[in-house]
From Swiss-Prot:
Keyword terms: Amino-acid biosynthesis, Arginine biosynthesis, ATP-binding, Cytoplasm, Kinase, Nucleotide-binding, Transferase
Marked site positions, Transition state stabilizer: 42, 255
Lineage: superkingdom: Bacteria
Task of the protein: Catalyzes the ATP-dependent phosphorylation of N-acetyl-L-glutamate.
Protein name: Acetylglutamate kinase
Enzyme Commission code(s) on record: 2.7.2.8
Catalytically driven reaction(s): N-acetyl-L-glutamate + ATP = N-acetyl-L-glutamyl 5-phosphate + ADP
Binding site for substrate: 77-78, 99, 192
UniProt pathway annotation: Amino-acid biosynthesis; L-arginine biosynthesis; N(2)-acetyl-L-ornithine from L-glutamate: step 2/4
UniProt xrefs under InterPro entries: AceGlu_kinase-like_sf, AcgluKinase_fam, ArgB, Asp/Glu/Uridylate_kinase, Glu/AcGlu_kinase, NAGK-C
NCBIfam families registered for this protein in UniProt: argB
UniProt enzyme class: transferase
Gene that encodes it: argB
């Protein structure tokens, strides 16, 4: 099976057989802990843009499914949308990090995310030996949207409600749901919703073990210019303090807020990590040290994580 290469690649080709065996043993308790649990993964950034990384990340997701973990994949597709808007000579701009989405732009967004990017991901999962079903919020009334109420950004929406039953049925059948962040309101009007937001709300609705945001940075950094200043573990209150202090800023703010909201609704842990780093998903989930930032609900949870030998 093609997924056999995922963990061996993550361990490094130069490792001797004994070292590889030790790494597999290190992964075992995590595999046992997460078996049968839902993990919602937001897939975007460099992990989607670069062909090699894209195939690698999806192969790692198939690996997780093969060992009994239940991944749900939510994807963006900003660069692909930009490319098609340029091809169609449709100007685009952003306000507060949100794509201004008029009727023409919304049509392209839905075409690209639902009809192109989503199906490409499903196909790549199939090629990696997995079985996936592509969906958007419209399908099976999975996600209902509503307007954000800001005329200047057009058809940019937020999640109104979620019907998790469809996803639960797919997961029980061994499928990997692949979800694009397009949904409609009660009148059928389509909305473009931030994929991080969709992932967080789905994680809460499904009672997920984890929410994972694959980004273009290693996680939350004390110094954005220093990748070695990674904060590996923090709780909701500390995360809020970092936002107020300006340590968390720019595009990282909505990602951290998304994690905070998911944790407040019962998700056990949220992770922010670099999706462009080789096998970061496996290393974050299945090793003691991890490679990104882990957020937990409370200081007590953080202390407990520390006592558990840095458990991810």
């Amino acid at each position: 099976m093609q997924t056999n290469s995922s963990l061996s690649e993550a361990t490094g080709s130069a490792c001797d057989p004994l070292t590889r065996a030790q790494i597999l043993i290190e992964a075992l308790p995590y595999i046992q802990q997460y078996q049968g649990r839902v993990i919602v993964i937001k897939y975007g950034g460099a992990a989607m843009v670069h062909q090699e990384r894209r195939a690698e990340v999806l192969r790692d997701i198939v690996f997780l499914a093969c060992v009994g973990i239940r991944p749900v994949l939510v994807h963006g597709g900003g660069p692909e949308i930009n490319s098609w808007l340029q091809k169609l000579d449709i100007p685009f701009k952003f306000v507060d990090g949100l794509r201004v989405t008029d009727a023409a732009t919304m049509e392209v967004v839905e075409m690209v995310l639902v009809g192109k990017v989503n199906k490409q991901i499903v196909q790549l999962i199939s090629l990696a030996g997995g079985s996936a079903v592509g969906l958007c919020g419209r399908d099976g009334n999975l996600i209902k949207a509503r307007s954000q109420g800001r005329a200047e950004i057009g058809f940019v929406g937020e999640v109104s409600s979620i019907n998790p039953q469809l996803l639960q049925t797919l997961l029980e059948g061994g499928q990997i749901p692949v979800i694009s962040s397009v949904a409609a309101d009660e009148t059928g009007q389509a909305y473009n919703i931030n994929a991080d937001t969709v992932a967080g709300e789905l994680a809460a609705s499904l009672g997920a073990e984890k929410l994972i945001l694959l980004t273009d940075t290693p996680g939350i950094l004390k110094d954005p210019q220093d990748r070695s200043s990674l904060i590996t573990l923090l709780d909701i209150e500390t995360a809020r303090q970092l936002i107020q202090a300006g340590v968390v800023k720019g595009g990282m703010i909505p990602k951290v807020q998304c994690c905070i909201r998911a944790l407040a609704q019962g998700v056990r842990a949220a992770h922010i990590l670099d999706g462009g780093s080789p096998h970061s998903l496996l290393l974050e989930l299945l090793t003691d040290a991890g490679v990104g930032t882990k957020l937990v609900p409370s200081q007590f949870s953080a202390q407990l994580e520390g006592l558990n030998n840095g458990s991810r």
